[in-house]
Curated annotation (Swiss-Prot):
Pathway noted in the entry: Cofactor biosynthesis; riboflavin biosynthesis; riboflavin from 2-hydroxy-3-oxobutyl phosphate and 5-amino-6-(D-ribitylamino)uracil: step 1/2
CDD domains the UniProt entry points to: Lumazine_synthase_archaeal (cd09211)
Source organism: Methanococcus maripaludis (strain DSM 14266 / JCM 13030 / NBRC 101832 / S2 / LL)
Family label: Belongs to the DMRL synthase family.
GO cellular component labels: riboflavin synthase complex
Record's keyword terms, sorted: Riboflavin biosynthesis, Transferase
Family annotation (InterPro entries): LS (IPR034964), LS/RS (IPR002180), LS/RS_sf (IPR036467)
Protein name listed in UniProt: 6,7-dimethyl-8-ribityllumazine synthase
Entry GO MF terms: 6,7-dimethyl-8-ribityllumazine synthase activity
Subunit structure comment from the entry: Forms an icosahedral capsid composed of 60 subunits, arranged as a dodecamer of pentamers.
Binding site for (2S)-2-hydroxy-3-oxobutyl phosphate: D72, T73, R115
Length: 137
């Protein structure tokens, strides 16, 4: 069984809540276990929580769940680009998959509502990566 940790952004919680529920349902469908969940204020705050979970022996992969909606400035792009870069670095540093389930940047609230399956897709990617990495070890 694949043990997952979820790191979930509270910002835009109405959307990340739906993303989280879809992700949980898909994890159960795939036979994966969500053994740890941590809420963080926003997507930019995820890396430290991810690092902490990756240090646990009972975590095979991390699923990130966040939603960054476009504003009047380029803030959304800065948040997602920096978070994604650090998330990828952590995956490589710890040798464990960290799946990017962050919707955005550059999307409206309506587009965000259409993309609530990003959490589900991240679960799919995390479980596949764990299984495929085990095949080559």
């Amino acid at each position: 069984m694949v043990n997952l940790g979820f790191v979930i952004a509270e910002f835009n919680r109405d959307l990340t809540f739906m993303m989280e529920k879809m992700a949980e349902e898909h994890a159960e469908f795939l036979g994966a276990n969500v053994s740890h969940k941590i809420m963080v204020p926003g997507s930019f705050d995820m890396p430290l929580a991810i690092k902490t979970l990756l240090q646990k022996d009972d975590i095979d992969a991390i699923v990130t769940i966040g939603c960054v909606i476009e504003g009047d400035t380029e803030h959304d792009e800065i948040v997602v680009q920096n978070a994604a870069r650090k998330i990828a670095d952590l995956s490589l540093d710890f040798g464990k998959p960290v799946a990017l389930g962050i919707a955005g940047p550059g999307m409206t609230r309506m587009q965000a509502e259409d993309r609530i399956d990003y959490g589900k897709n991240a679960v799919e990617a995390a479980v596949k990566m764990v299984k495929r990495l085990k095949e080559i070890q």
